[in-house]
Amino acid sequence: KIVAASDVYKRQELFCELVDLKPTDVIFDPCCGTGGFLISGMHKMLRAAKNDTERKHIKQQQIHGIEIRDDMFSIATTNMILRGDGQSNLICEDFLAQDPGELQLKGGGITVGFMNPPYSQAKGKDTANLSELCFIRHLLNSITAGGRAAVIVPVSAMIGKTKEDKAVKQDI
């Protein structure tokens, strides 16, 4: 399903709706930037939670993110703490270097992936592994079977014609 949204705020709310986010889901954003998708997801789950025990579990166990840039990681961590996430499950590392099998185990099993990967990082054969499609494949391999994902990519990412792009799309 392809949906356009005019600004990031609307996309954050839209992502929650597209994946039919439930208070039992475990959210993962591997390119979390400032944490906007995680915060939107957390708030939606907290509103749907039945009691304080569920709300506490959501905050402490069900929100996970990775950000590679130190500056953005600092902002994301601050944003999550200011919004009362309880225990910031964010790490400052390279998502593509993470083992998808280990990521699947976070919080009891990642059921929802949100992602706005860095654009236009693949400039040639040496950096083909940095394409938006490679990020999508790695995300899909990192969520549990039956999980859902919402991803923002430029249209050009979906019409890539290189052999590498075609192979990744086939894999996805």
Predicted regions and their residues:
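Single conserved hydrophobic/aromatic residue that forms the stacking wall/gate
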Residues: 1-5, 9
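Generic detector of intrinsically disordered, low-complexity, polar/charged segments
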Residues: 4, 30-33, 144
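Conserved S-adenosyl-L-methionine
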Residues: 10-112, 120-122, 126-129, 133-134, ...
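Conserved Class I SAM-dependent methyltransferase catalytic core
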Residues: 127-172
